[in-house]
Swiss-Prot record:
The keyword Methyltransferase applies. Its EC number is 2.1.1.222, 2.1.1.64. The gene is ubiG. PANTHER family: METHYLTRANSFERASE, UBIQUINONE BIOSYNTHESIS O-METHYLTRANSFERASE, MITOCHONDRIAL. Pathway: Cofactor biosynthesis; ubiquinone biosynthesis. Belongs to the methyltransferase superfamily. UbiG/COQ3 family. This is Ubiquinone biosynthesis O-methyltransferase. It comes from the Bacteria. It is an enzyme of class 2 (transferase). Coiled coil: none annotated.
Length: 236
């Protein structure tokens, strides 16, 4: 797929409409704010610390993960194709005094001048929103240095994930706007591993994340049956 075509305009428009609520801790992106500390800790611990390292956040949206990585000393570039979320991210970084370079571009196009440039690349909750996940994974691989880490997170495709993330989170609990997710675009761990195997990345770890609606708390779980993350490392 061409580097400038791996974009779904409907997905971009969906997140453009929600951009103004990105930093509302009780708004439509509340789940991401609750989830972010777990993601940040997993990335920082697995990569051996990101302080002083060059990090690319692919599909950064309004900058929740990007800002948290910058606050602990990473040199962060945020990449997204949504202009409204990027403007929100830039403004919030300015207001909070965090230095981040936000760029409107696809991973495939950004790769052209950033091959083996980053120590760490993150691609969280993004693969299920693009037409060609393999293309994004390859671009992430190409942009990380040998020995560097690439992190992916997405949602497993099964009955349980449909019930929890769409019926539960969107319709019953109203944690997310209806239509945020398309179950057909969810990616099974075996499928993601197969895509990773087509690159120079090696899967080092996989970890699930579960949500308790009674306590409102996310926590790690060894089960990857719904939300999950994988850590990969580029072969030297």
């Amino acid at each position: 797929m061409q580097q400038n075509t791996n974009v779904d305009p409907l997905e971009i428009a969906k997140f453009e409409r929600m951009a103004e609520t990105w930093w509302d801790l009780n708004g439509e992106f509340k789940p991401l704010h609750l989830l972010n500390p777990l993601r940040l800790n997993y990335i920082d611990q697995t990569a051996g610390g990101i302080f002083g390292k060059k990090v690319l956040d692919v599909g950064c949206g309004g900058g929740i993960l990007s800002e948290s990585m910058a606050r602990i000393g990473a040199i962060v570039h945020g990449l997204d194709m949504g202009e409204e979320p990027l403007e929100v991210a830039r403004l919030h970084a300015l207001e909070t005094g965090v230095s981040i370079n936000y760029v409107k571009n696809t991973a495939e196009a950004h790769r052209e001048e950033h091959r083996e440039y980053y120590d760490v690349v993150t691609c969280m909750e993004m693969l299920e929103h693009v037409p060609d996940p393999q293309s994004v994974i390859q671009a992430c691989c190409d942009m990380v240095k040998p020995g560097g880490f690439v992190f992916f997170s997405t949602i497993n495709r099964n009955i349980k994930s449909f019930v929890e993330t769409i019926i539960g989170a969107e319709y019953l609990l109203k944690m997310l706007p209806i239509g945020t997710h398309d179950h057909n675009k969810f990616i099974k761990p075996s499928e993601l591993m197969a895509l990773v195997d087509n690159t120079d990345l090696l899967c080092k770890d996989a970890l699930g994340i579960t949500y308790n609606p009674l306590t409102g708390i996310f926590k790690y779980t060894p089960k990857v049956d719904v939300n999950y993350m994988i850590a990969t490392q580029k072969v030297d």
